[in-house]
Swiss-Prot record:
Its cofactor is FAD. One of its GO terms (cellular component) is mitochondrion. It catalyses: (R)-2-hydroxyglutarate + A = 2-oxoglutarate + AH2; (R)-malate + A = oxaloacetate + AH2. This is D-2-hydroxyglutarate dehydrogenase, mitochondrial. Residues 110-289 form the FAD-binding PCMH-type domain. The gene is D2hgdh.
Length: 535
C-alpha cells in the first residue's frame, strides 16, 4: 500500500509489508518462560560491552583517573569464596578473563578490579549472599546488563559483583490487564518479544534493549524512546521485590493498579541505582500493542523549525504521537562515517524522527500525511521520508538508536544527559562549540525533544583533564541556571554523584544520605555511587 502523500513526498515513500512482523534482531527463544540474550542475537551495544578489553587498549583503573579513596571494607578471602560456593554452587566466577568484561563499563571510561563474580538464580540466593557480605563487611556491586552511561554498574575498587543475568524468568503475565511479573535479569528486548506475542508492548524502549536488564532499567529509572507516550517507570512499575543490605527480602511485588495503603515503598528503589537494595523482581503494566506504527524522518533547516515541527505534530497528531526525537547534522555524519548508515533525506542542519502508534492504520496514516503536508508547505521541513513497513521503520530508528555506538567509535566521549526547557535545549551545544574550539573533535546534541531531554556529547582523541576542566562544572552550572536537571534519565552513578547539588537543595541531599544510612548502615551496596560522600 502506497500512502497518498503529496507529490514532493511520493518518491521517498517506503511502503508497507503487512505480513512482516519480526525485528531485524529477532531469534528463537529457548523455552517459553526462560529469557535472556540468546546466542546469535546481534546487539551493537552488547558487542561493544563485551569487546572493550580484548579489542582495544586497557582501560585505566578508576582510582587512577578519578580522585576516590577506598573505604574500609573487608577483602574477599578463601573462606568467603567457600561460603559463596555453598550458596550458589558452580556459579562463583574467579577467572580473571571472565571478570575483565564485568569490571569495565561499555564506554571504556571506568574500570574496577573485582576478583569475584556471583551469579544467583533466585531471590533467596541473593538474600543469603547479602547476609554473608553484610556480616563480613564486603562491598557489593549489583550488575545487570552493564549498559549504564555513568559508571554505576561496575566496581570502583574490588567490590563483589552480584550479577542478575541468570535471574531471567517470567513469573506471570495476565493477558487482560497486561501486567507482567518477571525476575530482574530479563533482557528488555526479550521481554518485548514475549509480550508482543501476546499483543502488548513494554512501556519503555531503549537503544540498549538487546543487553539491558529490566531490573537495571528500574534501578536507574530509565527513560528512553517511549517516555513521551507512556511516561516514566515510576508510573508503570506496580511493584518490586527487593533484597536489602542485610539480606532481608522486601516483597512489594503487587500487581494492583490502585493501592493507597501507607507509603509507596517501591518508589524509594526506582532510580536508587542499587544503593538502597538489590531489585530481584518487577511487576509492570504493559500497554496494548499498537495495530499501526508509522515513522517519518525529516530534515529541518534550523532548531527553531524543529521546535515548530514538534508543536505542529503535537497539535495535529494528538494521542497517536508516540515519539519525537531530534539530532543534529554531526550525529548523522558520525553514524554514516563509523557505521555506514545511509542518510535517507537531503543533508540538513537538523533531523527529526516522528513516530505514531494507534489502532487504525488508515486513520493514523491520514493524520500523519496531513502533518507532513503542513510542515513541508510551511517551510519547517525541507525533505523527508516515511515508513509503515516494520523493517523500514527499524531502519529509520537505527539512525537515532545507534548514535551512541557511533560516538563510542569516534574516540573518548564526555557524555551529559540533561533536562532543559525545550526552547533552550540546543543553546548549550552551540555555546560549547565556541568554548571548546579545536580541543574537541565533535560537540553533538540529540535526544528526546518531547520531554526536554538533551544528550550532549563531546568526543576527543583521548581522555583529557584540560578538556574535562573546560566542560565541568561549566555544563552543570549552565544547566542549573536554566533550572534544569544534570541527569534526565541516565542516573548519577559514579561519575555524576558529586554534581547532585546542582539539581537538588542541601536539605534534599541530606535526607537522601540519611535514608541510605538507615537502609544500608554499613554502606556495602554499590558504594561510591549516586550520593556525594558525607563530610
Amino acid at each position: 500500500m502506497v500512502l497518498p502523500l503529496v507529490s514532493r513526498w511520493s518518491a521517498r515513500v517506503l511502503w508497507a509489508s503487512p505480513g512482516w512482523r519480526r525485528t531485524y534482531t529477532q531469534r528463537a527463544c529457548v523455552g517459553l518462560k526462560r529469557l535472556g540474550c540468546p546466542r546469535g542475537v546481534y546487539s551493537p551495544l552488547a558487542h561493544r560491552a563485551y569487546s572493550v578489553v580484548a579489542g582495544g587498549p586497557e582501560v585505566t583503573l578508576t582510582p587512577e583517573r578519578y580522585p576516590v579513596q577506598r573505604l574500609p571494607f573487608s577483602t574477599v578471602s578463601e573462606e568467603d569464596l567457600a561460603a559463596f560456593e555453598c550458596i550458589i554452587p558452580g556459579r562463583v566466577i574467579t577467572d580473571p578473563e571472565q571478570l575483565q568484561t564485568c569490571n569495565v563499563d561499555w564506554l571504556k571510561t571506568v574500570r574496577g578490579c573485582s576478583k569475584v563474580l556471583l551469579r544467583p538464580q533466585t531471590s533467596e540466593e541473593v538474600s543469603q549472599i547479602l547476609r554473608h557480605c553484610y556480616k563480613r563487611n564486603l562491598a557489593v556491586n549489583p550488575q545487570g546488563g552493564n549498559t549504564g552511561m555513568v559508571g554505576g554498574s561496575v566496581p570502583v575498587f574490588d567490590e563483589v559483583i552480584l550479577s542478575t543475568a541468570l535471574m531471567n524468568q517470567v513469573i506471570s503475565f495476565h493477558d487482560v490487564s497486561g501486567i507482567l511479573v518477571c525476575q530482574a535479569g530479563c533482557v528488555l528486548e526479550e521481554l518485548s518479544r514475549y509480550v508482543q506475542e501476546r499483543d502488548f508492548i513494554m512501556p519503555l524502549d531503549l537503544g540498549a534493549k538487546g543487553s539491558c536488564h529490566i531490573g537495571g532499567n528500574v534501578a536507574t529509572n530509565a527513560g528512553g524512546l517511549r517516555f513521551l507516550r507512556y511516561g516514566s517507570l515510576r508510573g508503570t512499575v506496580l511493584g518490586l521485590e527487593v533484597v536489602l543490605a542485610d539480606g532481608t527480602i522486601l516483597n512489594c511485588l503487587t500487581s494492583l493498579r490502585k493501592d493507597n495503603t501507607g507509603y509507596d515503598l517501591k518508589q524509594m528503589f526506582i532510580g536508587s541505582e542499587g544503593t538502597l537494595g538489590v531489585i530481584t523482581a518487577v511487576s509492570i503494566v504493559c500497554p496494548p500493542r499498537p495495530k499501526a506504527v508509522n515513522v517519518a524522518f525529516l530534515g529541518c533547516p534550523g532548531f527553531a523549525e524543529v521546535l515548530q515541527t514538534f508543536r505542529t505534530c503535537r497539535g495535529m497528531l494528538g494521542e497517536i504521537l508516540s515519539a519525537f526525537e531530534f539530532m543534529d547534522t554531526e550525529c548523522m555524519q558520525l553514524v554514516g562515517q563509523h557505521l555506514q548508515l545511509t542518510n535517507p533525506v537531503q543533508e540538513s542542519p537538523f533531523y527529526v524522527l516522528v513516530e505514531t502508534s494507534g489502532s487504525s492504520a488508515g486513520h493514523d496514516a491520514e493524520k500523519l500525511t496531513n502533518v507532513l503536508e503542513q510542515v513541508l508547505n510551511s517551510g519547517l521541513v525541507t525533505d523527508g521520508t516515511m515508513a509503515t513497513d516494520q523493517r523500514k521503520v527499524q531502519m529509520l530508528w537505527a539512525l537515532r538508536e545507534r548514535i551512541t555506538e557511533a560516538l563510542s567509535r569516534d574516540g573518548y566521549v564526555f557524555k551529559y544527559d540533561l533536562s532543559l526547557p525545550v526552547e533552550r535545549l540546543y543553546d548549550l551545544v552551540i555555546d560549547l562549540r565556541t568554548r571548546l574550539g579545536p580541543r574537541a573533535k565533535h560537540v553533538v546534541g540529540y535526544g528526546h525533544l518531547g520531554d526536554g531531554n538533551l544528550h550532549l556529547n563531546v568526543t576527543a582523541e583521548a581522555f583529557s583533564r584540560e578538556l574535562l576542566g573546560a566542560l565541568e562544572p561549566y555544563v552543570y552550572a549552565w544547566t542549573a541556571e536554566q533550572r534544569g536537571s544534570v541527569s534526565a534519565e541516565h542516573g548519577l552513578g559514579f561519575k555524576k554523584k558529586d554534581v547532585l547539588g546542582y539539581s537538588k537543595p542541601p536539605v534534599a541531599v541530606t535526607l537522601m544520605q540519611q535514608l541510605k544510612a538507615m537502609l544500608d548502615p554499613e554502606g556495602i551496596l554499590n558504594p561510591y555511587k549516586t550520593l556525594p560522600a558525607q563530610a
